[in-house]
């Protein structure tokens, strides 16, 4: 996918990996970058606008846990304004296994809801033009960090959902791929709660191992966007971008 002159919606593009990815996207010159985030960050938005004044950057407050119908209303506002949207990035996520319901609501259900809502505008069965979904999942969807089983399971669920959306592309016209960062130096991983406090030092222990910066992750994220491979499972770890070959142990046969 060519980012230049495209219209992109980025959910949670104002913090951590999201903000650095927004910076890299803006440098590539999209026509519009629409940022949907629960928390407003005027300083970051101003920085992005200054980075490339030719890009129109718009912010809408958005919580991914709202009902699908509310998301559809917001997307209608965006589509009415832009007419077309090329790429949806779902990047909302929390890492706190004390918040079980919210972890599932944000990391998994939020991804499902936003993707479901945009199908109203993209689905070729409804006369839509199709589109591309990039879902930020996690390497914990491959192998869990067992001290945070709720977070790991929510990301595995998001990964499975993304793989299914990709396989439905011939029906909907909507392609999808997953972005799976490894341990990245963000506020998210510097301090977080393990499930039932099974390992109070889990964040500290993770950071004793090699990590990557948010910039390294963002630069590889943009490479994945440009590659635009339906069904790709991208691992973004230690400054590398690698396509994962999924091992199939069962097939529905349909």
Swiss-Prot record:
Substrate binds at residue 138. It is an enzyme of class 1 (oxidoreductase). Transmembrane segments: none annotated. It catalyses: a primary alcohol + NAD(+) = an aldehyde + NADH + H(+); a secondary alcohol + NAD(+) = a ketone + NADH + H(+). Its EC number is 1.1.1.1. PROSITE patterns: ADH_SHORT. SUPFAM superfamilies: NAD(P)-binding Rossmann-fold domains. GO terms for molecular function: alcohol dehydrogenase (NAD+) activity. GO terms for biological process: alcohol metabolic process. The active site is at 151 (proton acceptor). NAD(+) binds at residues 10-33. The keyword Glycosyltransferase does not apply. It comes from the Eukaryota. Pfam families: adh_short. InterPro entries: ADH_Drosophila-type, NAD(P)-bd_dom_sf, Sc_DH/Rdtase_CS, SDR_fam. Keywords: NAD, Oxidoreductase. GO terms for cellular component: cytoplasm. The keyword Cell membrane does not apply. Homodimer. Belongs to the short-chain dehydrogenases/reductases (SDR) family. This is Alcohol dehydrogenase. It comes from Drosophila picticornis. The gene is Adh.
């Amino acid at each position: 996918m060519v980012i230049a002159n495209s219209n992109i919606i980025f959910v949670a593009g104002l913090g951590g990996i999201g903000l650095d990815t927004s910076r890299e996207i803006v440098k590539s010159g999209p026509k519009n970058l629409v940022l949907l985030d629960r928390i407003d960050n005027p300083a970051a938005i101003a920085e992005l606008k200054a980075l490339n004044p030719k890009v129109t950057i718009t912010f809408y407050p958005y919580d991914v846990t709202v009902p699908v119908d509310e998301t559809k209303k917001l997307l209608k506002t965006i589509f009415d304004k832009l007419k077309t949207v090329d790429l949806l990035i779902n990047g909302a996520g929390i890492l706190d296994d004390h918040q079980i319901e919210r972890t599932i609501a944000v990391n998994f259900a939020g991804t499902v809801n936003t993707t479901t809502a945009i199908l109203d505008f993209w689905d070729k069965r409804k006369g839509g033009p199709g589109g591309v979904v990039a879902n930020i999942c996690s390497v914990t969807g491959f192998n869990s960090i067992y001290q945070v089983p709720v977070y790991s399971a929510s990301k595995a669920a998001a990964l499975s959902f993304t793989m299914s959306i990709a396989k439905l592309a011939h029906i909907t016209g909507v392609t999808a791929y997953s972005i799976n960062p490894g341990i990245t130096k963000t506020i998210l991983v510097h301090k977080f709660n393990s499930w039932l406090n099974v390992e109070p030092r889990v964040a500290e222990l993770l950071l004793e191992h090699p990590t990557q910066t948010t910039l390294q992750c963002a630069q590889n994220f943009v490479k994945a966007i440009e590659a635009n491979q339906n069904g790709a499972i991208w691992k973004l770890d230690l400054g590398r971008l690698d396509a994962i070959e999924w091992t199939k142990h069962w097939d529905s046969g349909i």
